[in-house]
Design a protein with these regions (language model features):
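Extreme N-terminal basic, low-complexity initiation segments
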Residues: 2-12
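The substrate-binding groove and active-site-proximal loops of carbohydrate-active enzymes
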Residues: 32-41, 65-67, 99-104, 195-198, ...
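Short catalytic/ligand-binding loop motif for oxyanion handling, primarily in non-cytosolic enzymes
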Residues: 41-42, 72-74, 96-100, 132-137, ...
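A cross-family glycoside hydrolase active-site/sugar-binding cleft signature
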Residues: 34-36, 63-67, 89-91, 127-129, ...
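His/Asp/Glu-enriched short active-site or ligand-binding loop at hydrolase and phosphoryl-transfer sites
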Residues: 139-187, 234
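Active-site beta->alpha N-cap acidic-glycine motif
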Residues: 14-85
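C-terminal domain-boundary segment and adjacent tail
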Residues: 22-23, 56-58, 70, 160-171, ...
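Metal-dependent polysaccharide deacetylase catalytic core of the NodB/CE4 family, i.e.
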Residues: 58-149, 188
Length: 244
């Protein structure tokens, strides 16, 4: 087995997840359901909700943006048994903060993704913690000594060269290489974006933890909804281009 990261550290929450299509709770006849922060922690994996939804909505599918360093081989094996309705995508490496990718350059990004790929269970779909894949456009510049400051496009470039689809926010558009394969989540009315754990925010629509969705919003799908993985929606051309 491999070493699992320090899963007791706190993943910070900040207000970058503003109200938009990403945090809309209107009914979806077509749904690409995805969530952030799957890992081993009992209060961060949300397994009870996943099985509740699958039992209640037999067609249910979900793409889990999983923290590789914090997810054991045993957890991956358990999730892989359900790969007909659970898809594993990549959410940083250890998510020690929302600015993890500010500490990456091209080579470090490549090495992390090679380690992820060696496990053989993850789709080549990546989302940066806190959406901070490049500095500045989100209002949070990187320290000049940070690795990302040498080349603000380094993470994009490495992921693109390795064939990853990058899930991103609209405000990062000016910082992307033109050849990057990007899904701008702000523009996608078929995506249901959630977290495995409660988001304590004053923005009612931004309260998108699994339990909050059930108790405060209600699931924006039913048994007539057609569900697709992120990978399926990409392959079928279902995502809208970024509205730059």
């Amino acid at each position: 087995g491999r070493r699992i990261g320090n899963i007791s550290s706190i993943i910070t929450v900040w207000s970058v997840c503003s109200t938009n299509m990403m945090n809309s709770w209107v009914y979806r006849p077509l749904a690409v359901v995805e969530s952030d922060d799957t890992c081993d922690r009992w209060d961060r994996n949300g397994m009870n909700f996943l099985f509740h939804w699958k039992a209640k909505y037999p067609k249910f599918k979900i793409s889990l943006f999983t923290i590789p360093e914090r997810t054991s081989e045993e957890m991956l094996e358990l999730l892989w048994r359900h790969n007909d309705w659970v898809e594993l995508c990549v959410h940083g490496w250890n998510h020690e903060s929302n600015f993890e990718c500010y500490g990456w350059d091209y080579d470090r990004t490549t090495r992390f993704m090679e380690r992820v790929e060696s496990l053989g269970v993850y789709k080549k779909i990546f989302k940066a913690p806190g959406w901070t894949i490049t500095p500045g456009y989100n209002g949070y510049p990187a320290d000049e000594k940070a690795l990302i400051s040498k080349d603000p496009q380094a993470v994009y470039k490495a992921l693109t060269d390795k064939g990853y689809v990058i899930i991103d926010r609209h405000y990062n558009a000016p910082g992307r290489p033109e050849n990057a394969k990007v899904v701008c989540i702000d523009d996608q009315d078929i995506v249901v974006h959630m977290h495995t754990w409660p988001m304590e925010t004053g923005d009612k629509n931004g309260r998108n933890g699994y339990q909050q969705v059930v108790e405060e919003h209600g699931e924006p799908w039913d048994n007539n909804t057609e569900f697709y993985f992120m990978s399926e929606a990409w392959e079928r051309g279902m995502f809208k281009p970024c509205q730059k």
